Amino acid sequence: MKEKFNEKVIPVILKFINTKAIQSIKNGMVTSMSPLIIGSIFLILSNFPVKAVVDVLESTGIKPVLDQVCGATFSISALIAVIGISYSYAKLENQEPLNCGIISLATFLILMPSSITTEGGEVVSGIINKTWTAGQGMIGAIIVGLIVPPIYCWFLKKNIRIKMPAGVPEGVTNAFSALIPAFVILTGAAVILLDSTQQVLKLFTKLFRHHFRK
């Protein structure tokens, strides 16, 4: 039984683990470890289990600084993930990875709800909501990070790009090469947003939660 399992199941699992999508998620999520670990340290210090220490931190004005560092690191976890996953995917495809990460970040921000309703019922628009740049937006970040890079890489592989003459710096060449795929991807995100009234990331999250509740 064990031999049959090793012969039939293990190769399938290994094949799945070694797919570009899974490798990209793994490598991309690892990039968020450093800021999250640092943020966790500041979180522990800010909520130290000794009241006397907390009182000193509050009286000296250090606690708000600790909270700021903690909030800043945890509040961008989804942004780090979408950049890291996209970067890793493009790198596996041997394409320029940084532009891919930036395009994915822009796509994520386009699809993210950009308005909130205050307790008084006032709608505030044109914001970057930290709720969705943190853990709640992680599912959306993973999905965007797996959809954008294949499209980006397809354009570059098909040589559908703006070509620059020889002698132009590599950074400039890469930037212009990414213009066409960036235009198509960001325009597509805008069309999706127009048709969904800013509920795209919420839909991703709800579908994921509904699936795993079954």
Predicted regions and their residues:
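Signature of multi-pass transmembrane helix bundles
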Residues: 1-37, 42-44, 54-58, 62-214
